[in-house]
Amino acid sequence: LNCHNQMSAQPPTTTRCSRWETNCYKKRWRDHRGYKTERGCGCPTVKKGIQLHCCTSDNCNN
C-alpha cells in the first residue's frame, strides 16, 4: 500500500507502508496558525475535534 505522507500544503510525497498496514489516513485540525493536515500509513486514534479520514487504496489520502 502506498500512502501520501506530506504535511499540510507541502508538495505531494508518498511512502510505501509496511505490509501489515492496510490503511492510509488524513488528519485535519485547527490551531492558532490555521488548519493543519497530516497524512500517512495506518488509521490512528484521534482526540475530539480532529477530523480523520481512513481509506484502503493506494494514494487515497491526498
From Swiss-Prot:
GO MF entry, a single one: toxin activity
A Pfam entry, by short name: Toxin_cobra-type
Stated family: Belongs to the three-finger toxin family. Short-chain subfamily. Type I alpha-neurotoxin sub-subfamily.
Species in which this protein is naturally found: Naja mossambica (Mozambique spitting cobra)
Cysteines paired by S-S bonds: 3-24, 17-41, 43-54, 55-60
Location within or outside the cell: Secreted
Keyword match Methyltransferase: no
Function field: Binds to muscle nicotinic acetylcholine receptor (nAChR) and inhibit acetylcholine from binding to the receptor, thereby impairing neuromuscular transmission.
Superkingdom of origin organism: Eukaryota
Gene Ontology CC: one annotated term: extracellular region
Residues that span the membrane, as ranges: none
Protein name in the entry: Short neurotoxin 3
